[in-house]
Structure formats: C-alpha cells, structure tokens
Amino acid sequence: MSLQPRDVVIVDYARTPMGRSKNGCYRNVRADDLSADLITGLLARNAALDPAQIDDMIWGCVMQRGEQGFNVARNILLRAGLPHTVPAQTVNRLCGSSMSALHTAAANIMAGLGDVYLVGGVEHMGHIDMNQHVDPNPALGHSVAQAAGSMGLTAEYLSLLHGITREAMDEFGARSHRKAAEATEQGKFAREIIARIGHDETGAPTLIKHDETIRPDTTVEALSKLKPAFNPKGGTVTAGTSSQITDGASSMLVMSAAKAAELGLTPIAKIRSMALAGVDPSIMGYGPVPATQKALANAGLSIEDIDVVELNEAFAAQALPVLKDLNLLDAMEDKVNLYGGAIALGHPFGCSGTRITGTLLSVMQDKDATLGVSTMCIGLGQGITTIVERV
C-alpha cells in the first residue's frame, strides 16, 4: 500500500495489564502514575522520536476528580518527564473517551494542524468511584427515561427488544474469559502489555506482567447460577456477563505518514475511517450499529470487507444485539473479539477506546488481516467506530 503524506498512521500502541478495582494490584498506584509509566515505556521503544516533537497529548478520562482531576493529561505529561513545551488535554466522551482522543488527533493530522500525537486514556475505578458525586438534572426525565442513566438497565431493555436469552449471554461471557485466557497463554498480548510494578495480595511490590482480571475457569454453568445484577425480578444481566470494574491505562503513538517516514518509524496501520452516532439513551448499547454503518459508508466498505472486529463488551446483553444487526453473529468465531473482551479484561472507561483498538491491531498482525473495526457503545446513547487498514 502506498501512503499519502497526510495519511494518519499508528506507529505503536501499549497498555498496562488490567487490574481488578477491588483490592487489586493497583490499589496503591495512582491513575497518573499508571499513565506516566506507560508513556515512558512506549516512548522508550520509539527512540527515533524526540518527545519535544509531540504536537499534543490527548488523554481520555471520565471521572475527572481527585487524582484524575485538574486536567489529568497535563499532570501525566509532567509526571512522565516530557518537555514542558508539549501541551496536553483531557477529553471525556464517557466510554468512548480515548477513542475520541484518537479521532481528534487523526482529524488534526488530516487538517495539517500537527504531525505527532500521543493519545490514550486512563481510569482508576478503584480509587474514583463512578457512582459518587454524580448529580443528573431531574428535568432530564421530561425527555429521557430515568432508567437510561443505569447502563445495566439499558442492557436489559436492549436484550428484551432483540430477544437475547440468558443462555446466549452466559455463553458469550464464558467465551470472553476463554479467549482472553488462551491469548494470555499463547503470548498474544505481549505486543501491547508493558509490565509495571503493582502489589500482590500481601501488599508486597511485584511486577505485574499479565491481566489480573481473567478467570480461565469460567464456565457457562457457573455463570448460569449468578443472580441478576440490575433487575432482581426477571432480569437476565449478571455481573458475569457485564464488563468488569477495573483499573488500567492505554496509549497510542499517532503520526502523519510523512513524519513517520522522516523518522524512520514503521507504521502498523492507517486510519481508514472514523464515525460517531447518537441513539436513544434507553438503548445506549446499540450505538456501535449506526456508528459502524456510518464509518463503513464513509470508507466505501461493507461489513463483509472487514476481517477482524473488536467490540467493547459493555454487556453480553448489549454486544449480541449489536453483532446481530451488523450481520456478525455467524462470523463471530472467525472475526469478533478473538482475544476476549471487556467481560474478561474489564472496561476502565477512559482507557478502553485505545485499548480495544490496540488489541485489534494485535489480532490483525497475528492473522495477517487487512481491515479491522474497533467500536464501542457510550453511556447516554452514543456510538464510536474506527476502521483501520494495515500497511
């Protein structure tokens, strides 16, 4: 493939191992330190880039308070020891924050506003409770169902609309853990994980090399015994078929093709298309469908042209309707979340967008795939999609 000078290319990507939020390996590690150490590792393996050449650092984070407040991106940049001349901004599109950071960087490169961007995101859900200090306007109830603020209830509603059974959800949840465990055992995450110091059960410092969240022994039978998590009377969504509450950070180094060539850095993929969409907040999990359809149309592609898909697993009850309406259910075993997803790895809000896009690139390299889609739903009714093409 021949690249044009202003094509947007991903040169490298990395993430921390995912940690459980409740008494997990990062319980004594701050969100800004998680990110700063990750950035240090990513830049160290791209030594041809002088960090002073970074035009902007764009970092996703949802719960922007405490250690994640006061423009955490700038705090991370300073903590990582990057030149003070490099600017930084924190973005918040809820679950889609770091993918939105990627899109902003890509749009800037296409427009000629810059050549080098460091993007990513973080969420320490163990330190910053997602349910505290949230004060939705009561007047929203005039135009939006009050239950739309409960992501679990929106997943319940979506599953009812699409006839998704409890059995199908449990099978999907078990698959996520099985695929993630297999990927770990086979070293498939080695490209993307940068090990870091955390703490073991006794509180002793230890090097965290793998995701703490995966449960290899998860079975459909075990999941079938769990009680509903959001609707105790007749509900089907359980903790076992929901994305885990976790701590983590992810990052990508994004450039114009011209700058990558100038620095002698080899691109992994180029951004082929990007799209956003809105949906009724009551079915917020459906957002990936219109977002992906829009991204495909913008690129002149069909879903059949796509080799690999990473869909953020907010809930099995949400993922299955999306796959159904994108005509991916029959192709799931060959194309979708082949290294597991957020049910096994977790969904640290600000981190997940570049996390799933990085994992997509890992899968594409292993499968020698050409075209890939990363997509996710977003709380309160949005969807975001990125289409990448390997170079």
From Swiss-Prot:
Gene: fadA
Top-level lineage group: Bacteria
Active site: 95, 347, 377
InterPro entries the UniProt entry points to: FadA, Thiolase, Thiolase-like, Thiolase-like_sf_Thiolase, Thiolase_acyl_enz_int_AS, Thiolase_C, Thiolase_CS, Thiolase_N
Protein name: 3-ketoacyl-CoA thiolase
Catalyzed chemical reaction(s): an acyl-CoA + acetyl-CoA = a 3-oxoacyl-CoA + CoA
Keywords: Acyltransferase, Cytoplasm, Fatty acid metabolism, Lipid degradation, Lipid metabolism, Transferase
Assembly, per entry: Heterotetramer of two alpha chains (FadB) and two beta chains (FadA).
Source species: Saccharophagus degradans (strain 2-40 / ATCC 43961 / DSM 17024)
Annotated pathway: Lipid metabolism; fatty acid beta-oxidation
GO terms (BP aspect): fatty acid beta-oxidation; phenylacetate catabolic process
Entry's family note: Belongs to the thiolase-like superfamily. Thiolase family.
